[in-house]
Each structure stands twice: as C-alpha cells, then as structure tokens.
Design a protein with these regions (language model features):
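Acidic, surface-exposed loops and disordered segments
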Residues: 1-120
Length: 120
C-alpha cells in the first residue's frame, strides 16, 4: 500500500490533457464509491460529485468555466457540488451513536444544536 507521504509527493497538477485518453463511466463510479468513505465535517457528506464526460456537456461547462481549454481536452470534468442543507441530517446521522451508547443524550443534543447553529 502506498504511504500518504508517497501519495502527496507524487501528486501533480495537470493543465494539459491528451484528448485521446478516455475514462469509462465504470472507472468513475469505482472512484466515487471510494470517495464516500472519506471523512467530512460532522460526517454530513456535504460534497456531491457529478462527472461530465459527454463532449456537448463539457462544452457547456467550458463556457461556464471561463473557457478554460483544459475542460475540453480532459477525459472528464468533475463538478463538485456542496449541499447547503446537509446540516439538517445531523440528528439522524448521530442517532446511531446515541442508540449504541457512544454518546449520551446531552452530547447528542449539544452536537445537533452546535452544528445547526454553525450552519444557520
């Protein structure tokens, strides 16, 4: 398994892509199924990812993205959307911890209250 340090050192930003390289919908699905395991603030899973591989749709994204040329040559464009209402799920998300006794009623109520206050 690759270490975190190796991953960070190997990562590069790309601005030029080979338009002949494609990525399949299955490969994208596999990647995004793994992303679901990544932690998020308060476990709310705010981010939603929408892959765009259709050339016509990529042209629309190209226009919306200030005509960045890399949008047209990339295998896929990933639109990252944030759920501004995700905090409404803090109660149901934490009910499992409450029912298992990981947190008590006071901690549950404080968590729901503080997360809600932070977002409203």
């Amino acid at each position: 398994m690759t270490s975190f340090t190796d991953l960070v050192k190997a990562r590069r930003s790309a601005n030029k892509f080979d338009p002949s390289v494609t990525i399949s919908p299955q490969e994208l699905d596999d990647m995004f199924n793994l992303v679901k395991f990544a932690p998020s603030a308060f476990n709310l899973q705010h981010a939603h990812y929408v892959p765009v591989i259709d050339q016509t749709k990529k042209e629309q994204v190209h226009e919306a993205a200030f005509k960045q040329y890399k949008v047209l040559t990339s295998s896929a464009v990933i639109a990252v959307l944030g759920d501004l209402e995700a905090y409404h799920n803090v109660g149901p998300i934490n009910e499992g911890l409450l029912s298992l006794g990981v947190i008590d009623q006071r901690e549950f109520e404080e968590t729901v209250s503080s997360v809600t206050d932070m977002y409203e």
